[in-house]
């Protein structure tokens, strides 16, 4: 549902807009108690069984947008409970990052194969013959699946000549490539933090908007209000994210208008990272010191490797991620600035909270959250005309935003600066496929390879914090790549 302007996205956007307005207008945070009535007006529910439930859900969304955790559902409480703790101009984060709002969950049934009304009770009944657990029988003249015996292999569905067997899927669980979505005592979805790698795919695939992440936009705006020098570093996926008329130069001008002191392309850090990883590959993999090299720019991919495949930790590149490399570059000229990563990625919020990174990056917001900030300041790119040149990076770094772009950039650097070096590359996208690739690498099937992993199917342009359809985003990124030079220069690696 990414890129489709559904009611779920409309509510999320409105929440971010209102929180941003509270920040810019420096309103009393106790007034947040009134917002559910402004966002959900009237007396009749539109999407739920009760307008009171709709407002309660909005209240929980407001808390998450302030960086706070959900309130307990079984105790009397207020939206603004402990609000003073988040009323600061520094990064505020209460784990976990992603949470299921219990009152918003539809309690969708778990995965199962179901016989539909198209079943003809045919003589061949191939479904019964292929079932490895003998879970299918005839009942009242039709096929019947015993869910207690079924192992959900799907063989029956494949062989039914009438297409009468369908797969029921729980959208959030189906989108999760690591099996982190479980079920609580009431049949609602819950996220197992020990399994989750914070890609956010469950969030964007829930049709009821029951899963949300925490935001830092209020604290960011408060820092601006206090006079801090705040620099935005834009992830390569930013082009096209704010509409067809929002050119890179207009986006930079708009960012300056809403309070940022300067704007950088994170592709600058990606250019440096591509060179560094090219060097790493040539010196370590091409010489046989390492069996393979895994890219490290996608935090969900890196987290997957470290959490599920600790044996490959040494093969994960130790090059600075583009976010960190760009933040360091920006601090060379502005050592006292607060650095804000603006990108498509939910997991970057966790990366920036790590002990080794938190001093480099002060805030992380998504394109979706930035759109809410633009709304709060009434920036409409259909009529906005200001421009400021934004042309910091080369094509290799800009291409990091699309799947295979990272490996392609590194290979381009190897071909350019280490001619004659043979390089084998592979890439995967989506956590389920990433797990398969790591299993292959672990078992020795990827010797000599440079392997790029992207947690989101499609790459960064398909991240949970994006605003437009993936295909449109890919087109815009590739166009922006062509507008730059093809390769980075060696001196870029100083960052």
Where in this protein do the model-derived segments appear?
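Cysteine-cluster motifs in flexible loop/terminal segments that predominantly coordinate metals
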Residues: 98, 102-112, 122-127, 153-156, ...
């Amino acid at each position: 549902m990414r890129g489709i302007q559904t009611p779920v996205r409309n509510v999320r956007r409105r929440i971010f807009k209102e929180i941003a307005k509270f920040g810019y207008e420096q309103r009393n945070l106790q007034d947040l108690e009134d917002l559910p009535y402004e966002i959900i007006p009237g007396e009749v529910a539109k999407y739920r069984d009760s307008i009171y439930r709709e407002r309660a859900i909005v209240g929980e969304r407001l808390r998450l947008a302030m960086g706070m955790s959900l309130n307990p559902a079984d105790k009397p409480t207020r939206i603004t409970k402990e609000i003073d703790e988040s009323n600061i101009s520094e990064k505020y984060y209460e784990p976990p990052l992603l949470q299921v709002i219990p009152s918003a969950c539809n309690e969708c049934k778990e995965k199962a194969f179901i016989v539909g009304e198209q079943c003809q009770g045919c003589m061949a009944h191939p479904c019964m013959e292929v079932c490895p657990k003998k879970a299918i029988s005839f009942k009242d003249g039709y096929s019947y699946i015993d869910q207690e015996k079924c192992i959900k292999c799907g063989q029956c569905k494949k062989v039914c000549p009438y297409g009468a067997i369908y797969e029921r899927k729980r959208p959030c669980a189906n989108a999760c490539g690591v099996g982190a979505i479980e079920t609580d005592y009431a049949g609602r979805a819950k996220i197992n933090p020990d399994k989750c790698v914070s890609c956010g795919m469950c969030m964007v695939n829930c049709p009821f908007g029951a899963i949300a992440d925490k935001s830092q936009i209020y604290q960011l705006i408060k820092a601006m209000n206090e006079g801090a020098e705040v620099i935005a570093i834009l992830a390569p996926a930013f082009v096209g994210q704010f509409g067809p008329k929002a050119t890179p130069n207009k986006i930079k001008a708009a960012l300056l208008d809403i309070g940022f002191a300067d704007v950088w392309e994170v592709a600058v850090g990606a250019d440096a990272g591509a060179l560094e990883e090219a060097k790493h590959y040539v010196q370590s993999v091409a010489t046989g010191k390492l069996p393979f090299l895994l890219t490290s720019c996608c935090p969900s991919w890196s987290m997957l490797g470290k959490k599920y495949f600790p044996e490959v930790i040494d093969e994960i590149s130790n090059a600075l991620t583009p976010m960190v490399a760009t933040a360091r570059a920006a601090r060379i000229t502005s050592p006292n600035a607060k650095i804000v990563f603006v990108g498509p990625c939910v997991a970057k919020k966790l990366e920036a909270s790590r002990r080794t990174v938190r001093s480099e990056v002060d805030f992380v917001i998504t394109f979706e959250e930035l759109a809410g900030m633009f709304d709060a300041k009434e920036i409409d790119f259909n009529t906005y005309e200001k421009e400021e040149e934004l042309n910091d990076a080369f094509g290799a770094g800009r291409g990091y935003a699309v799947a295979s772009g990272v490996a392609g950039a590194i290979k381009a650097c190897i071909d350019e600066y280490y001619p004659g070096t043979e390089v084998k590359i592979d890439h995967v996208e989506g956590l389920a496929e990433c797990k398969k690739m790591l299993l292959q690498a672990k078992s020795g099937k990827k010797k000599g390879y440079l392997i790029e992993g992207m947690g989101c199917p499609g790459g960064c342009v398909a991240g949970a914090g994006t605003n437009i359809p993936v295909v449109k985003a890919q087109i815009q990124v590739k166009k922006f790549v062509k507008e730059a030079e093809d390769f980075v220069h060696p001196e870029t690696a100083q960052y």
